[in-house]
Amino acid sequence: MLQVYLVRHGETQWNAERRIQGQSDSPLTAKGEQQARQVAERARTLGITHIIASDLGRTQQTARIIADACGCDIILDPRLRELDMGVLEKRHVDSLTDEEEGWRRTLVNGTEDGRIPDGESMQELSVRVQAALADCLKLPEGSRPLLVSHGIALGCLVSTILGLPAYAERRLRLRNCSISRIDYQESPWLASGWVVEMAGDISHLDAPALDELQR
């Protein structure tokens, strides 16, 4: 059975400011660095063999802290990037017009073809993150990879494993530096293939960040 751990990056400056990041970037805050150190301490006990991270700066920062704790190198994979949020990137959530808020909601409220202008659909996101996950099956036997990615990207991945469409209404909250686990297995009791063992665990964090869109 292959176990794959999933970690969202630590809190960033734009998370704290409630700005839309997408594939734009901002650095980790001091709190985000502390979250990364705390999830790294947990990861150190899990027998992690590979760290695979989105190539955006905030995930690289988080991955470096985890990799140092686990004694692993980092493999960068752009397929693990966050959803491209198009023309809304860098905008403050509270500054959106009604029309712009409508664009954002089509992504997370179950609209199949929803996308922000110049951005990416949830289905396109799903295809690339699923491909990145599938490549974990090519790792040597006995591997235990940890993927460092983003809130919407990881939420989409876990939700589709549970059988929801990529564009389903968002019902899974993955806070900064939460940890999830998915397993690939053959089982007489569960569906064969990927199953969700744990999602969004923050028990290792002393002060988890709020979801920036829920404040």
From Swiss-Prot:
Q: What is its EC number?
A: 5.4.2.-
According to its UniProt entry, the protein's GO biological process terms are: glycolytic process
Query: Part of which pathway?
Result: Carbohydrate degradation; glycolysis; pyruvate from D-glyceraldehyde 3-phosphate: step 3/5
Xref: SMART domains: PGAM
Q: Which residues form the active site?
A: 9, 82
**Keyword Isomerase set for record:** yes
Which InterPro entries does the UniProt entry name for this protein? His_Pase_superF_clade-1, His_PPase_superfam, PG/BPGM_mutase_AS, PGM_Phosphatase, Phosphoglycerate_mutase_GpmB
Q: List all disulphide bridges recorded for this chain.
A: none
Instruction: Locate the site labelled Transition state stabilizer.
Output: 150
Q: Where does substrate bind?
A: 8-15, 21-22, 58, 82-85, 104-105, 151-152
- CDD domains, sorted: HP_PGM_like (cd07067)
Task: Cite a single GO MF annotation.
Answer: phosphatase activity
GO CC entries: cytoplasm
Keywords, sorted A to Z: Glycolysis, Isomerase
PROSITE patterns documented for this protein: PG_MUTASE
Q: Which reaction is recorded as catalysed by this protein?
A: (2R)-2-phosphoglycerate = (2R)-3-phosphoglycerate
What SUPFAM superfamilies does the entry give? Answer: Phosphoglycerate mutase-like
Q: Which family does it belong to?
A: Belongs to the phosphoglycerate mutase family. GpmB subfamily.
The protein's name is Probable phosphoglycerate mutase GpmB
- Organism of derivation: Enterobacter sp. (strain 638)
